[in-house]
Structures are given as C-alpha cells and as structure tokens.
A protein has these predicted regions:
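Active-site bordering "gate/hinge" segments
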Residues: 1-241
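Short, glycine-/Ser/Thr-/acidic-enriched flexible segments
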Residues: 32, 96-98, 146, 215-217, ...
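Short polybasic amphipathic segments
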Residues: 199-201, 260, 270, 350-360
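Short acidic-glycine loop/turn motifs at beta-strand connectors
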Residues: 204-205, 214, 264-266, 356-359
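Oxyanion-binding "anion nests"
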Residues: 227-272
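Active-site lining segments that contact anionic ligands and/or coordinate catalytic metals
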Residues: 241, 257-259, 266-269, 291-295, ...
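Dual-mode signal for accessory low-complexity, basic/Gly-rich regions
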Residues: 271-335
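Intrinsically disordered terminal and processing segments
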Residues: 322-369
Length: 369
C-alpha cells in the first residue's frame, strides 16, 4: 500500500479537484504541510497542471494585523484575488502553527479586514457555485495534522493524525471508491429533501422552523471538503422562526464561543446569548448580513465521532445538525450576502428530531427515510 501522503495527494487531485492537463492549480497552506505538499506538487506536475503555492509562515497573520496601516488593512490581497479569478482549481490545506494567533486582535481591525475581503468572497462563492459550469473554480478544503490542531482537539499528534486520516477514509483499500459510495448514499437523501417545503429542527433546547421551498440541497460528497459527509441547503431568508441552541463550541477568529442560543423572528436573529464568549456574538452580529442564516445542514460522517473544535470535521459529525449565519451558497439558491459565514453545530443523538412537511424523517441522529 502507498504511504498515506501519496494516497492523500491522489485523492485530493483525482477525486476532489479532478485535475486535468493544463489546469492552473492554486494551493494555499503553511510550511508545516510540506510532506503532503511535496506529494501533491509531484502528482500535479505528473498530471500536467501548472501549480502555484502560497505559503504561510508562523506569526504571519498577527504580523499583518499588528503592522498594516489602514490603507493596507482595507486593500485586497492581489495574488489571492487573481488566483480566485483566473485559476481552475484551488486547494486550501489547513496546517496551522497557532490557532490562537489572532485571538487578541482589535475587533475593529477584524471588521475592516472582513469588509475588505467581501468582493473576493463574492468572486469565490460565484466561481465555486457550480464546479461543472464553464469558467468555474473547483475547490477543496482539507487538513494536514499539526501540533496546534492536535492540542485544540485534546489529542496527541499521533492520535490526531489517525483521526484525520480515518475521517478521510485514507485507510480504506480504495479511498476514492469509499467516497463514491458515500456520494450515492447521500444522493438519495438530497433528492428527498429537494421535494420538501418546510422543515423543523427540534430537541430539548431547540425548536426552529424554516422554509426550503425553491431551494436546492447539496450532496457534500468529499469533493469541496475533505473530509465531508453532509447535506446542506439555504433557508428562505425571512422564513426562519424559533430558537436554536448549539451544543458544540464554535470558534470565530481564534476565539471560543460555547453554548450559543439564538432567537429568530421572520428570518432575523433578534437576540443571542452564550455560556462563554458572548462578546464575540456582539461583534459578529454587527457585521452586515450576519443576522440572517445562510445555511442549514445535517452531518452524516459517522467516521467522525467526536468534536475536535475544528469546523471542517465537527460540522460533518454523524448525528448532528448545523446552521451558518451570514453568506449563503449560490448553488442552493440562497440570497443572503455577508462577509461572514460562520457554522454552529448541535448534537441530535439524545433527543433530536427533524420534521419535513410535518413528517418525522430523522430521530436521535439517524435518518428514518
């Protein structure tokens, strides 16, 4: 059997990004991911792709916020924008040095930077909406195990590496075949939900309703995110009503927020509370468009069995649902626009239920359809 990094590289390029000769591939990562990057670059070159790599180094983000004058803080990153406008494929390999690096940055600076990136975010969401459309950008977000991520997950690096590779099915004889089977299984759920008009998430601390009439559900099958395992859509913006409690911790710009409760009327989040980090919510909901939901979703990856305080994995946990405030996905038919897209997750395995047009379709973390 090939070593893990070779298998990972082939899965990312063959399955996730479907790299072809002549493709322009843009990779964003850190120097810590070098073992994987070497194999990705080697294989991309063998496939005939032109590859450019944007490397982060330790402390770069904090250095930028600490030293950038306002005119730089509010400007667009030139190469990043050009790559998102012109390249064929974008691979974002998360390999952090320090997940708390920007935790103490001035909130006003964060807000200015977020607003400055709005146009680039719009380009990204437009070009990734349909990967099969002419001129589309095929994208994939994945994880390379580092000490920082392992510490955040309360694991050793060895344990965390095993967790990441299991979540991606890299230990399977044929990882690509595993993801093709997941695609087939989730397609049945997607097609059922596409016919639904109104949904309700319900549990001990949650009772929230929303319309998905005219919206499209997406089968997240490991191409855009590796790992994946979810179905998601965008609620009709003014249809969301009720209260939702998120049992998993959420992280925004390096800051922890736990036990989030949101109250919603006619789509707008009118009240919020948190057991920890409530001041972060005050900052978030001052951002344009953040008071409305951009995504509703159901996690289906039962190879992920615990929270690691990493949204790439946590939102896919089998037996959870999540909702995101802010930017909605164009491919779902969502209309909300914002410089933020922040996912929040809750466990459904104890008392959770999902109703579709009044019919119970999901209970205690499992679909009934």
């Amino acid at each position: 059997m090939e070593n893990t990094q070779i298998r990972y590289a082939k899965l990312l390029l063959d399955y996730c990004l479907e790299i072809k000769p002549g493709d322009k591939l843009y990779i964003a990562t850190s120097m810590l991911a070098e073992p994987l990057i070497r194999e990705v670059y080697r294989y991309a070159t063998q496939l005939g792709a032109q590859t450019e790599i944007d490397f982060q180094f330790s402390g770069k983000s904090k250095m930028f916020f600490d030293n950038a004058p306002d005119e730089l803080l509010t400007s667009e990153p030139v190469f990043h924008k050009k790559a998102l406008e012109e390249f064929d494929a974008y691979l974002n390999i998360r390999a952090p040095y320090n997940l708390n690096e920007t935790s103490n940055i001035d909130p006003e600076k964060r807000k200015k930077r977020s607003e400055a990136l709005q146009e680039i975010n719009n380009i990204y969401f437009e070009r990734t909406a349909d990967r099969h459309a002419p001129g589309a950008l095929r994208r994939c977000l994945c994880q390379y195990p580092t000490e920082a991520s392992a510490q955040k997950a309360n694991m050793s690096l060895e344990e965390y590496s095993a967790f990441v590779y299991q979540a991606c099915h890299l230990n399977a004889e044929n990882p690509k075949a595993e993801w093709l089977k997941i695609r087939e299984d989730q397609q049945r759920i997607k097609e059922y939900l596409d016919k639904v008009k109104e949904m309700q998430y319900k549990s001990d601390k949650t009772d929230i309703r929303f319309s998905v009439e005219g919206r499209t559900w997406i089968n997240s099958d490991g191409q855009a995110n590796m790992p994946s395992g979810e179905v998601f859509s965008a609620p009709v913006e003014d249809s969301v009503n009720g209260k939702v409690y998120f049992s998993y911790p959420s992280i925004y710009m390096g800051r922890d927020v736990s036990g989030i409760s949101l109250w919603v009327e006619n789509g707008k989040i009118i009240k919020w509370d948190a057991e920890e980090g409530g001041e972060v919510l005050d900052q978030v909901f001052s951002i344009a468009g953040a008071n409305y939901f951009g995504e509703v979703a159901i996690g289906t990856n039962y190879n992920i069995r615990q929270s690691t305080r990493n949204i790439l994995f946590d939102e896919k946990i089998g037996g959870t649902i999540h909702m995101a405030v802010g930017q909605s996905y164009k491919q779902c038919g969502g209309l909300n626009r914002s410089s933020i897209h922040w996912d929040m997750i809750t466990d459904m395995t104890e008392s959770g239920q999902i109703y579709a047009d009044g019919k119970l379709i999901y209970e205690k973390g499992k679909f009934l359809i």
